[in-house]
Amino acid sequence: GETIEQAGRAGELCFAGATVFDGYLGTSNDGVFTADGYFRTGDLVEICGNPPHYYQIVGRCKDIINRGGMKISPTELDTLLEGYPGLVEAAVCSYPDEALGEKICACVVVEPNQPAPDLTAICSYLLKRGVAKFKLPERLEILDALPRNPMGKVVRAELQVIVRDALQKVRSGAHRT
């Protein structure tokens, strides 16, 4: 890959050194190291501040949404949506699209006794906070809870399954969101 040296740009954190392991035991190590021997962490980091720079982890590379060639960090949208009035929690995930590769779905949990937002309201909220139009979700799923791992982190892969199941129901005429 390329070395990123300017603040505001994000890339995958890779490193090498005498104490870096040689690979995983008993499994394929394809893609674990770069061509020049750097270990690929899978963490997406952004360079921040003026020199000396510091690095901030902004997400996982596997979670990046590729919508028509545009790379979108779901973490940015998650953070903004968590401030939406009447929501307990929110996260976005991708779902397959023939034309664009992937589209974005906002998955939200609404506070008890609060009205559920609609997609137009969610998009308007995001636009007012400076989100580019290509990053806006095309779908909204209202959930009882977001799937989480034992550490409490949202499991996007499970969100994607929920969204795909909902899309299947829509296509079969059994569900509307």
For every predicted segment, state its role:
Residues V32, Y125, I162, A166:
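Residues that form generic nucleotide/phosphate-binding pockets
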Residues E2-D36, M70-I72:
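Conserved ATP/PPi-binding loop(s) of AMP-dependent carboxylate-activating enzymes
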Residues V161-T177:
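Acidic/polar alpha-helix N-cap and adjacent early helical turns
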Residues G17, D22-G23, G37, L44-K135, ...:
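AMP-binding/adenylate-forming catalytic core of the ANL superfamily
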Residues G1-E2, A91:
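Glycine-rich, charged/polar anion/phosphate-binding loops
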Residues G1, A7, F33, T41, ...:
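Hydrophobic alpha-helical segments, especially N-terminal targeting/anchoring helices
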